[in-house]
Amino acid sequence: MSSKLKVLQVIPRLDYGGAEIGCYDLAHYLSEQKSKSYIATSGGKLTKYINKKKVKLFKTPVHSKNPILVILNIFILSLIVLFYRINVIHVRSRAPAWSCYFAAKITRCKLVTTFHGTYNFNSSLKKYYNSIMLKSDCVIAGSNFIFKHISENYP
């Protein structure tokens, strides 16, 4: 049994933005540290720069809010976690966070979420949708401002 850290990062698209660059950088950093690094995404401009020898890339519809695709992603992510013996799922967005949450429960994998921005919550339904980002084993706030936002709005 291998004790090597194996991290699956899940992000809707790998285009150019703070969350995306963070995902890209962490994936390559983990591989340099002799950990196994995986990314699940629907695609994006940064995918062509992923070092495929160091980071395993899965193209899946994790960007979708369609309930059928969210359910499909639960099964896809669960299979990835089980097949590759992933230790940690790290999700950086609300839409895929729902799939990751249930995949982590099914597989008993640790779940980390990164809260990169403030989310509107004009209704209690929207606030509930956003709250998935706090239902993990570890929540990372992207800044002190985001930490304050989380503390004040999601007690």
Give the label of every model feature segment.
Residues 1-155:
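Membrane-interface segments of envelope glycosyltransferases acting on lipid-linked substrates or membrane lipids
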